[in-house]
Amino acid sequence: MLDIKRIKEDPEKVKAGLRAKEVNCDQEVDRILALDKERRDIIFATEQMKAEQNKVSKAIPQLKKAGEDTAPVFQRMGELKSQIAANDETLRTVEAEYRTLMLSLPNLPDEDLKPGGKENNEPLRYFGEPHKFDFPPKHHVDLCTDLGFIDYTRGVKLAGSGFWMYTGLGARLEWALLNYFIDTHLADGYEFILPPHMLEYQCGETAGQFPKFADEVYKIQNPTDDRTHYMLPTAEAALASIYRDEILAEADLPKKFFAYTPCFRREAGSARAEERGMVRGHQFNKVEMFQFTRPEDSDDAFDELVTKAENLVKGLGFHFRTVKLAAGDCSASMARTYDIEIQIPSMQGYKEVSSVSNARDYQARRGNIRFRREATGKPEFLHTLNGSGLATSRIFPAMVEQNQLKDGSVKVPEVLQKYLGGLEVISKK
């Protein structure tokens, strides 16, 4: 949620910032300003009436004592009571529309981002060299099938299209990746979280994914009551709400977390032909990094998360690039995002394996998450940041394809070998 003060101070700048995200919210901004004025006018008028009500109420004993007619006074008291009740009802309606519109506005992009969509994304740096083969490489679907890593047919039989089932050494490779991520984050001093996989609506609202994307996640309706839960599309939705409606001590910041969860996505639309396999599915494993920081520390925290994501990919031996996203390619909740992209040989080009983002105070305002500033004793909204650390659904196919040998076997990355009993190469039985 944006700061209303920021909108009121320079509404045209806010409109321009949102247009840089390729979103035109001019009408919404104008309506928010009108509702804010109407809200303040109603509150002022109600306070005036309550003051008159209090004054009239105090005058009644003196009027009775003097033997004067109190009927007009009681009539006025009744009028004030009715007017206050009507104002309260109007205020509830105004505030409901105001909140709905405020929740609908995307976050403003940082001013150094290029406007527009992905065509204006800016590669910042490259690591390593693109992988080259001296033989015709296989697609990861064929490699995973031949080596018994994944059973696509039975995965579909169990859950339908967009699902797969890890088997044998494939399951162990997947778990090795996750353990590598987890051990690295623990060594960096981050706290491990295993959150619920089903969340309340407010979690999606705080993260900025709801209400806009509420229909794009899986819902579970409790048959015994009216409660609806949502399968988490990413651990960010859970982590962002850990301190919802709380005030933290400044001395306790930053809070550094990571969480492992399966992620569930409906993924509207069908996958493209080149995305066959496990590149795009309805369920995948991911480790998510998250920080709560003071506003003045969030830029350094962002750099830290980017470096952590890069180091995880480096450790696996991949060539990759780090890309600064243009304003319009950042998600609605984020002020800035860097993507870490690797090559999956069968797909050509680069595919994102980690997005690291700074939401500034956008999520904190939506979730009312604050810290108490020691110097002033006053609560302030903190900043939230998140990043994939990492998701496996693209790392796994890239690892299998880039590490394949001419005979159809696959080399195990050195950092994963300890999780597989020292196994260095996996060959077809």
Question: Where do the protein language model's features map onto the residues?
Answer:
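TRNA-recognition modules of translation machinery and tRNA-sensing kinases, especially anticodon-binding
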Residues: 126-429
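N-terminal alpha-helical targeting/anchoring segments
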Residues: 1-131, 149
